Amino acid sequence: MNKVAWVFHTPPHGSTAGREGLDAILATSAYSEEQALFFVGEGVLQLVNHQHPESILSRDYISAFKLLDLYDIEARYVCQQSLVSWGLSEQDLLIEVEVVDAQALAQLLHHYDQLLTF
């Protein structure tokens, strides 16, 4: 069985990478038992609550991250240093995550067979 890690490292509205990544996760959730999401660097901005992408004529896919619970995708990690660099805390995020430091995040990534970045 493939263990897949999805790494979000781009901001939410500068490209379609975040939306495409989320779509891919939801589409493949039935085929892979062990999946985890990692949010690093600008990727932590994917999860910031109370975004209004329609004001910049962007599609609001951010709220679809709430679907992860319905798909039983519970392994969700956010880089602590990335949160701090953006002046954010766990309370600013849309979904429940585990906040880990960069070293722990790197160790977690080693458990996965495939890494897909968005």
Swiss-Prot record:
Gene3D superfamilies in UniProt: DsrEFH-like
Location, primary (coarse class): cytoplasm
Domain of life: Bacteria
GO CC terms of this entry: cytoplasm
Subcellular localization, as worded in the UniProt entry: Cytoplasm
Pfam families reported for this sequence: DsrE (PF02635)
Entries under InterPro entries matching the protein: DsrEFH-like (IPR027396), Sulphur_relay_DsrE/F-like (IPR003787), Sulphur_relay_TusC/DsrF (IPR017462)
Keyword Heme: no
Disulfide topology: none
Keywords: Cytoplasm
Residues spanning the signal sequence: none
Family the UniProt entry places it in: Belongs to the DsrF/TusC family.
Task performed by this protein: Could be part of a sulfur-relay system.
PANTHER family: PROTEIN TUSC
Protein name stated in the entry: Protein TusC homolog
